[in-house]
Amino acid sequence: LIENQNSDDPVREIRIEPAVESDAESLAAVSRRAFEHDVNYGSPGISGPPGYDSPTWQRQAMKKGRYYKILEGDRIVGGFIVFPLDGEKAELGRVFIEPDCQNRGIGGRVLAFAESAFPRVRHWALDTPSWNLRTQYLYEKAGYVRVGEIDPAGRFTLIQYEKKLA
């Protein structure tokens, strides 16, 4: 449970819980809205990463990594996946938040949750599109450092980030 102590913030209480297969439809719908909303922030088109709008992909991801849902009350407002790579290294993937819940500090809470939920992980990795300045700012503010760029699908550049904990 992550509680917000700021009484001025309209998101008073956010819970982060493991996602289950019955959440796949809701997660796919929120993911679709979140990634397609990025067109307002520089995305070259209305789309997202492979499988972003597929309930089947969401269920498969639950088997490949630790998939979490973000809840406000009983409403799923986002999700993210932690892919453990080994005992001390993990990748944070597919962080997405419902458009009407964005810019409220939830992303920062997700990053803090991941680090606290996986205390053995000392090396975090993630990536974000080069056009998404909002997520770049979030990750850099949280201590992530740019380490490279890739263009895996030939569509746009992803900026790779890492964070090493002491």
Segments predicted by a language model, with ranges:
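Conserved GNAT-fold acetyl-CoA-binding loop/helix
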Residues: 15, 29-57
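Conserved beta-strand in the GNAT
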Residues: 69, 75-84, 91-96
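A short helix-loop-beta-strand connector motif used in the catalytic cores of GNAT acetyltransferases and
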Residues: 55-69
